[in-house]
Regions:
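A conserved regulatory-domain signal marking ACT and ACT-like small-molecule sensing domains
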Residues: 95-197
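Glycine-rich phosphate/pyrophosphate-binding loop at beta-loop-alpha junctions
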Residues: 1-35, 75-120, 130
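Residues at the C-termini of beta-strands that transition into short coil/loop
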Residues: 44, 88, 189
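Active-site-adjacent helical/loop segments in soluble small-molecule enzymes
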Residues: 26-82
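Short low-complexity, flexible loop/linker segments enriched in glycine and/or proline
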Residues: 4, 57-58, 156-159
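A short, charged, Gly/Pro-tolerant segment at domain boundaries
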Residues: 68-69, 87-92, 193-196
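Glycine- and other small-residue-rich loops at beta-strand/loop junctions that grip anionic moieties
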Residues: 18, 22, 40-41, 60-63, ...
Length: 197
């Protein structure tokens, strides 16, 4: 609407910030925005997820996605040595949405990841991988042991491991340890993560 210079209707709006997901600005409000707003910052869903995780982990606050727009916008601005007020509003969020956002945030920060390795199909291999991961302080969340990846079952078994890490550096350390042990690890991309939008 600001670009067009008049109130315009979008064909669709797709965002997790549902409280501000409007296709058309208000007729009465729009002239005030034209006259008084200096700039508009566009925030994508992945930035809102990071802002949500920051608020939960660092401030122990739950703020709905639309209420986090101001926090996410701060990362686009030079706020050093300035007094800034970021208004946080709303707690309209159900537990399932909250859980999903936290999970996606952990994935974006490399705090949760899945790696696939091929193992010889013989006793002790799973224990060997588990011991290596424990040594690297990788916390196993989930294991998927697939013996049907190959026609020759004795040749290889696929093991998919979902792990908790401290961040990107730790994740890379775990992957390097698996590589060093001769496992040719492959990172598995999570389907449906917000970063794919």
């Amino acid at each position: 609407s600001l670009r067009q210079g008049q109130v315009t209707t979008l064909s669709e709006v797709n965002t997790i910030a549902d409280g501000t997901a409007v296709k058309r600005p208000g007729e009465k409000l729009f002239p005030y925005i034209q006259e008084n707003v200096d700039d508009i910052i566009t925030i994508d869903d992945s930035e809102l997820i990071v802002a949500f995780l920051d608020m939960v982990e660092n401030h122990k606050m739950i703020v709905e996605n639309s209420g986090l727009l101001t926090v996410a916008a701060l990362k686009h601005m030079d706020v050093q040595k300035k007094k800034i007020v970021s208004i946080l509003s709303g707690g309209n969020m159900d537990v399932i949405t909250m859980s999903s956002i936290v999970q996606h945030g952990l994935i974006q920060r490399d705090r949760v990841f899945t790696v696939s390795v091929l193992l010889p199909d013989k006793p002790g291999e799973l224990a060997r991988v588990s011991a290596l991961l424990a040594k690297e302080q990788g916390n196993i969340i989930k294991l998927e042991h697939n013996q049907f990846i190959s026609i020759n079952r004795n040749a290889a078994v696929e093991l998919r491991i979902t792990l908790e890490a401290f961040g990107t550096e730790h994740k890379n350390q775990i992957v390097a340890a698996l590589t060093g042990a001769g496992y040719r690890p492959k990172l598995v991309k999570f389907k449906g993560t917000y970063s794919e939008m």
